Amino acid sequence: MNLAHMNLAMFFEGTGQGVAGKITNVTRLKDLCVEDERQRVHLEPGPGTHFGAYFFGKVCGADCRVILRSARRWFQQNYRTLPSTDVYLFGFSRGALLARRFAEWLEKINVSVQYLGIWDTVDSALKIDVSEACPKSVRYARHAVARDERRRYFKLLPLRLSAPRAGEERVFPGVHSDIGGLYEDNHDIADATLTWIAESAVERGLRLKPDATLPRRLDLSKLPTHDSFRLLSNLWGLLGSSRRTFTSCRLSGASSSALHPIEPRKTGTAGNVKTMG
């Protein structure tokens, strides 16, 4: 087959996710993507899912370097300069940190990123240093961040954009796993962030399946959120609390205490994406 253009879409799951049915918005978006010769798709399970690192991978991201090596191998096996190739990177939590680190590596080898879509980057991985600055080789980026996360160990790593046209960092109501789609009892906020990131990726060439359907946009100010700090099943709260500040985030014209809601939209299409009305 003589291809004039190809997409490479790479997905980095969050800590402990991507195996045994444990998924977030990262895998949900990956599963909506077309996979063929014109678009190759790759998923990296999150830290704490690799043999020998089940505990320390979850605690401190000990297997992050293993994940990056695996991602580089896949990229080197699949990237082509002819035909032209667009690269799309996605990640949640530490997976977002890895997606950003991978984008920095691509910049060093003179490969641009067509789109970077990430959910609530947390800066809590050993020996993985990532800059707040978005690599200039990233053509467009979107970063969905959690307004209400209070756990100290889930320190946000903002995405500093070189110019407004380079992307958007938006604060959503909810805690870390509300944003990334980890809670099973309520997906409303996660659905909103999934649609926000996916639609922008499609506008920039990501191909979704013909029957792919994204959730409609909602007024998030009326939706319930979780309290990750008080959940008994979560021991991270024992490490202390710290309220996030958003001085470097663009808040869509609103303060952090009065988030601009995503407006509802009618059923329609975005590229080849349907939204549920």
Task: Specify the residue positions occupied by each region the protein language model found.
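Active-site- or binding-pocket-proximal scaffold segments within functional domains
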Residues: M1-G277
